[in-house]
Amino acid sequence: MNKVLEVRDLRTYYYTYEGVLKAVDGISYSIMQGQTLGIIGESGCGKSASSQSILRIVPSPGKIVGGQILLYDQEHPEKEPQDLTQMDPRGKEIRKIRGGRISMIFQEPMTSLSPLHTVGNQIMEAILLHQTKDRKEAEERAYEMLVKVGIGNPRERLQEYPHQLSGGIRQRVMIAMALSCHPSLLIADEPTTALDVTVQAQVLELMKELQSELGMSIQYITHDLGVIGEVADYVAVMYLGKIVEMGSLEQIFRNPLHPYTDRLMKSIPSLRKRKDGRKLESISGTVPIPIGIPPSCGFAGRCPVRKSGKCDCAVPKLTDRGDGHLVSCFLYGDEEEDSVEIPKPKRKKWGRSEG
C-alpha cells in the first residue's frame, strides 16, 4: 500500500495573552491508502487542531511552529511529497489541495453549509474549482453524488436550501460535497455527533461503502469509542496535544497500555458490565488547559498509577512495545522526550501573530 499522508513532529501553538497554548505538541503518524486512522480523546486534547493543521485552516492566533505534513501523490508515487506546512494558508497551492486531494466533513452541517445557497450550488462549487468549468457537467456530477450518498429525489434536493433538510440528509450532503472531487484523504471531524443513533449507523455504513468503492483513506476524529470500533483500522489516542498511545484497533481495544487509554475503555457501556452489576468507571478531574504546564506527563495529575518524582518531572517518550504498538508512559520504560524550545512568534506591527 502507498503512503497517503505523513505527519512528522507537528506542533501547532496558540500565542495568547495568558501564554503559549500547545494545542498540538509534537505528534507523528502516517496514513496508508485505503486505511482509516481513528483519533480519539476527550475534548481539548488537540484532535481537531491536528486536522485543521493539515488543511492549513488553524484559526488566529494559532500557528504551526514546527514539524512537517507530507502529502504523497497517489497518481505519481515517484514524485517527492509536498510539505503542506511550507504553503501559504491563503495561497493558490493549498487551495488546489483543499476539497480536491484532501476533503473534510465537519461536525455540525447546519453551521458548515451556507444558508444562502442551494445544495446543488454548494456541491458544484468544489467541482467547478477542481474538476471542470462546465456548469452542466458540474451539475450532473452533483446529482450523481447525491444518488451515491443515498438521498431520495436528488434532482429536487439540488434546488433546496439546507434549512429545508433533516439533520441526516444535511450530513449526507456534506459527505457528497467532500467526496465530489474523489479525494485521496477524507478528514471526518465527529461527523455523527449531532445525529440520532439510527441515522448515525446509516451514515457510518455509507462512509464505509464509499471508502471501499473509491479507495480513499480516512482520518476519523471522535470521542465516541463505539464509533471508532466500527470504522478504524488503526487508532491514535491523544491527550493534551500529544499522542500517548497508537496501534491497530485490536491492540488498542484488547490491550490498552497507557493508563489514560485504559480508563477510556473502562468507561464504555457494555451488556456484560450491566449483567455483572459493575458501574462505569470515570476519569477523575478534567483535561487541563495546556498553558504553562511544566515538563511532565500530561496525564500525571489524573493518573491512578503515576510514579511520584518521575511522571510529574519528565515527559515520557513514545516507544514501540512490539508489533507497532506505541505508548508514552514510564510504566514501560524510562526513556524521556527531548526538550523543545518554544519558538517566539513573529509579530506584525499591530502585535498579532502571523497566520
Locations of regions flagged by a protein language model:
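A short, flexible loop at the N-terminus of ABC-type nucleotide-binding domains that lies
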Residues: M1-V4, Y13-G26, I57-G62, E75-E80, ...
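Conserved ABC ATPase "signature" region
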Residues: K136-E156, M265
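The feature captures the beta-strand-to-loop junction immediately N-terminal to the Walker
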Residues: I40-G41
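A short, proline-enriched helix->beta-strand linker immediately N-terminal to the Walker B motif
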Residues: S180-S184
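Conserved ABC ATPase signature
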Residues: E160-L165, I169
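Charged, flexible cofactor/metal-binding loops and thiol motifs
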Residues: P77-Q82, L249-G355
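P-loop NTP-binding/switch modules centered on Walker-like glycine-rich loops
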Residues: R56, I187-P191, L195-R278
